[in-house]
């Protein structure tokens, strides 16, 4: 039932979606936040999609790494290991920057943020709540100095495919 609503206890929990012909008996759900984002984005009769920072990152573990980059003992953040050419972050964020927060939401050392009292999600969820051309505020540590950056979000243009089929 691709395209049909998925209802639980009289509430919409998503829309059924099929991804691949080869994926028989596998059900995928488009959740309400994605549906709402799409509908709001399409109000101008043009779908722009989700923004993407275009970064690679890793968790900050151990005692030496946080100290080396200038993190306080109880402070979180993620270490940037790369920035995609032409992405939203290109030219503004750099390899070895530590992202501390986005829009004043602190990032844990494992890269998660608290969505509510009982649920943590990847910090990039914060980007998914925005639209192309909106700006976000990022606090970083670069060379042991704290910097605040206003970063405009762009549509991500991928130069290579995600997968190959033969």
Tell me what each language-model feature is.
Residues 110, 125, 130, 137-166:
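C-terminal, low-ordered peptide segments at domain boundaries
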Residues 23-25, 50-52, 74-78, 94-95, ...:
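Extracytoplasmic
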Residues 3-6, 10, 15, 30-31, ...:
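Terminal peptide-recognition signature
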Residues 1-3, 7-36, 105-114:
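Active-site loop architecture of trypsin-fold serine endopeptidases
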Residues 11, 18-20, 33-35, 58-61, ...:
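Solvent-exposed coil/turn segments that connect beta secondary-structure elements
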């Amino acid at each position: 039932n691709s395209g049909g609503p998925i209802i639980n206890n009289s509430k919409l929990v998503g829309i059924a979606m099929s991804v691949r012909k080869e994926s028989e008996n596998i059900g995928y759900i488009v959740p309400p936040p994605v549906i709402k984002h799409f509908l709001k984005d399409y109000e101008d009769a043009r779908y722009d999609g989700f923004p993407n920072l275009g970064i690679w990152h890793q968790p900050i573990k151990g005692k030496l790494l946080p100290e080396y980059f200038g993190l306080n003992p109880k402070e979180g953040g993620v270490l940037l290991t790369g920035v995609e050419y032409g992405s939203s972050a290109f030219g503004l964020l750099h390899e070895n920057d530590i992202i501390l927060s986005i829009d004043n939401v602190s990032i844990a050392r494992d890269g998660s943020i608290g969505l509510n009292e009982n649920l943590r999600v990847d910090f990039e969820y914060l980007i998914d709540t925005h639209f192309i051309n909106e700006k976000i505020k990022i606090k970083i540590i670069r060379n042991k100095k704290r910097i605040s950056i206003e970063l405009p979000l762009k549509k991500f243009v991928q130069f290579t495919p995600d997968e190959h089929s033969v």
